[in-house]
Amino acid sequence: MKSTFAALLIMVGCLVSGALLTGSEAAAAQPVTLNYANFPPASTFPCIQMEQWAHEVRTRTRGKVDVLTYPGGTLLGARNMLRGVMSGQADIGCISLAYHPGVFPVMSVFELPLGFTSAEAASSVLWELYSGLRPAELERVKVLTMFTSAPSHFMTVTPVRSLRDLQGMEIRGAGTLSAILEKLGATPVSMPMPEVPEAVQKGIIKGLFTSLDVMKDMNFAEMTGHVTRADQAVYPFAVIMNREAWERLSPDVQQVLDGLAAEHAAWTGRYLDAHVQDSMRWAEEKHGVQVHTLPEEDIAAMRRSVQPLFDAWAQRAADKGADPDAVMRTVDALKAQYGG
């Protein structure tokens, strides 16, 4: 009787342990799902980057991680993206630093007209600057990668052939680019990019000051028939992750995500540089958009006009305990390394 009872106990124990093993294996095989929120339309470069990054994560983790993407403000909008990721409404989000004035005193150096002519160089320098400095302003989130827009130009309803034509013109800009517009005599109007097409169509603004990919991606070629080349500042972006969501990931998955950071900064810039050229060809050929170049004396005047913005940034950074001279030296060294 005792031997029969013992045999039953062994059998039950084997069944239970087998069930537990199967359950743990099933749990281990279950992919982690991450929500990635973005605010501009799906056709724009931050969302193209999002989809490419999600694909790479799925592939390189061999299915351990799935990424659900939410473009066009379907999960979080531009104004609440930072807060939403920090509170866990989304695991991952893309933020435009320009939409958060005063929050990023060090990294907002990238809103200044630093002289970049390529998004690839600007994006790589931005990521290297962050990686080297790790400023406290971003320590509450995990930064997965950073990248920039292409250099900013004027897209306007009426032609801008000189700085005189800009005087008093209502132009959309964000962050420091609004301040650049003001220094040049325009009337800056700040609003998230998804609101801009309607504002142009209603005549609330007469144009925008940003990179030329939106001529095609957001169909501004139909609304603004003129482009004035200015090669002004870029817009910096950061892909951020909720800290608790990051810490829940296994070390091997964290390693994959970290390995994508510099690679994706360069990939996004490279994609954008090619796409800007494509967008402008399309805008000129299909919509007859006219391209204007400012006179040399106006270009020199622009450089002089924006110098106070560098001084103001340096003061804000110093007030937050940063060394603005060291930051600018690092930017200059990295810019020389990666080219303009």
UniProtKB/Swiss-Prot annotation:
(indol-3-yl)acetate binds at Y99, R172, T210, S211, L212, D213, Y235. GO terms for cellular component: periplasmic space. CDD domains: PBP2_TRAP_Dctp3_4. GO terms for biological process: transmembrane transport. Its main location: periplasm. Residues 1-29 form the signal peptide. This is Solute-binding protein Dde_0634. The keyword Transmembrane helix does not apply. It comes from the Bacteria. Pfam families: DctP. Solute-binding protein that binds indole-3-pyruvate and indole-3-acetate (in vitro). Can also bind D-tryptophan (in vitro), but that is probably not a physiological ligand. Probably part of a tripartite ATP-independent periplasmic (TRAP) transport system that mediates solute transport into the cytoplasm. The complex is comprised of an extracytoplasmic solute-binding protein and a heteromeric permease formed by two transmembrane proteins. Belongs to the bacterial solute-binding protein 7 family.
